[in-house]
Amino acid sequence: MNSLLMITACLVLIGTVWAKKDGYLVDKTGCKKTCYKLGENDFCNRECKWKHIGGSYGYCYGFGCYCEGMSDSTPTWPLPNKRCGKK
């Protein structure tokens, strides 16, 4: 029983360490980072792969840069308690 509990705890820990998130990049005003060329987009891909973002791939979806594989600390749209362009 103890070994089963220990294995479960290890799996949960591994999942949280390797967890990556997907979402829309936000600019300094809290809005989605805008793009116009839908689908594969060099601008979005470059923005997502920046060192402080840590994403693995980015593309334009719904006129916003959508990133995959970002670190959990990267803010994504919508920001809690903040509307786009409002304080």
Curated annotation (Swiss-Prot):
Keywords: Amidation, Disulfide bond, Ion channel impairing toxin, Neurotoxin, Secreted, Signal, Toxin, Voltage-gated sodium channel impairing toxin
Stretches of the chain forming a coiled coil according to its record: none
Entry keyword Disulfide bond: yes
SUPFAM superfamilies: Scorpion toxin-like
Residue span, LCN-type CS-alpha/beta domain: 20-85
Alphabetical GO biological process terms: defense response
SMART domains, per the entry: Knot1 (SM00505)
GO cellular component: extracellular region
UniProt main location, coarse: secreted
Disulfide bonding pattern of the chain: C31-C84, C35-C60, C44-C65, C48-C67
UniProt cross-references to InterPro entries, sorted A to Z: LCN-type_CS_alpha_beta_dom, Scorpion_toxin-like, Scorpion_toxin-like_sf, Scorpion_toxinL, Scorpion_toxinL/defensin
Residues bearing PTM Cysteine amide: C84
Keyword Lipid biosynthesis part of the UniProt annotation: no
GO MF: sodium channel inhibitor activity; toxin activity
UniProt similarity note: Belongs to the long (4 C-C) scorpion toxin superfamily. Sodium channel inhibitor family. Beta subfamily.
Domain note: Has the structural arrangement of an alpha-helix connected to antiparallel beta-sheets by disulfide bonds (CS-alpha/beta).
Purpose of the protein: Beta toxins bind voltage-independently at site-4 of sodium channels (Nav) and shift the voltage of activation toward more negative potentials thereby affecting sodium channel activation and promoting spontaneous and repetitive firing. Is possibly lethal to mice, freshwater shrimp and crickets.
UniProt name for this protein: Beta-toxin Ct17
